[in-house]
């Protein structure tokens, strides 16, 4: 499935590719795994997305995936450092420090991918998505 949204005159194309069932958080947390592609003006980034929906992702799920991706980037951007991030999201009590580091790097990657893709303000589009699609 693919969908295109228009934000302030810019077309944002969202597509996904089903990757199968995954257990990224342990065996009892089975999720469908997708690779989501965001294309703006011919430039493209991709990210991993896990959800309960089955293949293919419908338009509303693709928009939700973009919102989650952008929210991760904002979480990174708003934190002073990895330890501030950990406290904000309750990871300061998290015993697996490697997992914390992986989550931090994933959020940093989301921010870096978005800012390398386009000059659309990450906060403004995230708020717009939330208001427009009731996320």
Give each language-model segment a name.
Residues 1-12, 20:
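Negatively charged, low-complexity tracts enriched in Asp/Glu with abundant Ser/Thr
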Residues 1-4, 127-135:
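Short intrinsically disordered terminal tails
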Residues 10-12, 40-44, 133:
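Generic alpha-helical hydrophobic packing signal
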Residues 18-127:
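Acidic, low-complexity, intrinsically disordered interaction modules
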């Amino acid at each position: 499935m693919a969908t295109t949204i228009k934000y302030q005159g810019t077309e944002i194309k969202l597509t996904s590719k089903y990757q199968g069932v995954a257990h990224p958080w342990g065996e009892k947390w089975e999720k469908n795994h997708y690779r989501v592609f965001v294309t703006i003006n011919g430039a493209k980034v991709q990210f991993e997305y896990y959800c309960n929906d089955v293949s293919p992702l419908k338009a509303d799920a693709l928009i939700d995936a973009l919102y989650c991706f952008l929210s991760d980037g904002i979480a990174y951007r708003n934190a002073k450092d990895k330890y501030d991030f950990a406290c904000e999201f309750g990871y300061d009590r998290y015993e697996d420090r490697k997992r914390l580091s992986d989550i931090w790097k994933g959020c940093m990657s989301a921010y870096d991918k978005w800012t390398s893709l386009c000059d659309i303000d990450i906060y403004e589009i995230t708020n717009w998505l939330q208001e427009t699609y009731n996320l």
